[in-house]
Amino acid sequence: MSRIGKLPITIPEGVKVSLNDLEVRISGPKGELSKTFKGNIVVLLAENKLLVKPLAVSKNARAMWGTARSIISNMVTGVKEGFQLKLEVNGVGYRAMVKGKYLNLMLAKSHNTKIEIPPDIKIDVPKQNIIILEGIDKEKLGQFASIIIKQRPPEPYKGKGIRFENQFIPRKEGKKN
């Protein structure tokens, strides 16, 4: 029995859910999301609540049960409230700015790094060293944040690089003579 999978998902006011075979489509004030699940689980709508049930007793069906429930719960939260991630750019001369539909990063490389911003993600750069990402799809938001972080991951000696806000980076001691 999955502890997460058996919990019902309450649908808040202003959010509409439609179920077609294996596809779950959720729309709300912030936008619309849809996801198709494989045949291991079934999603039921009952009295303003969504229930996720496994179709088989197989190991794969039980593994996807809690995962599918969490994905659907994040979809409901996303179309109702949205998600936000903050990234910090640490380092001398490291800067970020938005130019059109590109995020321009200056990260002490021989060239500036340009990353195309996906259409469903909004980026705000209030300061040169803070990047705020907003969107309704938690999965795409995390994927895009990881693409940004991969450009210059935080290093353990001086802490320079791009990281999530309040992320702990274990520090190492430098060389001793």
Curated annotation (Swiss-Prot):
A cellular component term (GO) from this record?
ribosome
What's a BP term from Gene Ontology annotated to this protein?
A: cytoplasmic translation
Q: Does the keyword Ribosomal protein apply?
A: yes
- Record keyword Ribosomal protein present: yes
- PROSITE patterns given in the database record: RIBOSOMAL_L6_1
GO MF, one annotated term: rRNA binding
From the UniProt record, list the coiled-coil ranges: none
Q: Which UniProt keywords apply?
A: Ribonucleoprotein, Ribosomal protein, RNA-binding, rRNA-binding
Q: What does this protein do?
A: This protein binds to the 23S rRNA, and is important in its secondary structure. It is located near the subunit interface in the base of the L7/L12 stalk, and near the tRNA binding site of the peptidyltransferase center.
Concerning PANTHER family, the annotation shows: 60S/50S RIBOSOMAL PROTEIN L6/L9, LARGE RIBOSOMAL SUBUNIT PROTEIN UL6M
Q: What is the similarity comment for this entry?
A: Belongs to the universal ribosomal protein uL6 family.
Q: What is this protein called?
A: Large ribosomal subunit protein uL6
Species of the source: Rickettsia canadensis (strain McKiel)
